[in-house]
């Protein structure tokens, strides 16, 4: 058709993964999203009650239909606490065993220097352990009360960017 063009890109299959045709096949890396909410922080104590972590919500899960096994009790590492260096090392060891090549840490930076849930990542940086590749994923959203099922829809902490 006049005035129209068709672009065709070559594709190759490298180890079962489709990639754009180039000088060499690119390899996709398997990374795991790392949620740092599995340790207590003062803000969560204030908003949700002393000792709140994401495990609190796991324990509240209910069975809604036949064969719906809830709440699920975590296997292998149990109800771990990310303040414990051995837990973080065990997670990296397990990830490596199953072919995961790195963690993508959720990074809660709200602006004006305010960060939350930063302790596990800070300890990894300070100690260099576990020796496991990583990246950061900025969780750029404000927190409101309804996120955990309460009727309070007030702003808990605002994202300023």
Show which residues each predicted segment covers.
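Glycan-processing catalytic domains of CAZymes
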Residues: 21-161
């Amino acid at each position: 058709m006049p005035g129209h063009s068709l672009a065709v890109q070559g594709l190759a299959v490298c180890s079962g993964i489709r990639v754009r045709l180039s000088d060499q096949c690119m390899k996709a890396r398997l990374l795991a999203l790392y949620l740092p909410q599995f340790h207590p922080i003062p803000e969560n104590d204030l908003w949700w009650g002393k000792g709140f972590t994401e495990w609190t919500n796991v324990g509240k899960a209910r069975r809604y239909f036949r064969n719906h096994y809830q709440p699920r009790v975590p296997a292998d590492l149990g109800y771990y606490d990310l303040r414990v260096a051995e837990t973080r090392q065990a997670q990296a060891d397990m990830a490596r065993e199953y072919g995961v090549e790195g963690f993508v840490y959720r990074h809660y930076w709200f602006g004006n220097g305010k960060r939350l849930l930063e302790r596990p990542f800070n300890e990894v940086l300070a100690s260099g352990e576990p020796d496991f590749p990583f990246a950061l994923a900025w969780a750029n959203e404000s927190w409101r009360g309804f996120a955990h099922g309460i009727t309070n829809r007030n702003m808990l902490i605002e994202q300023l960017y």
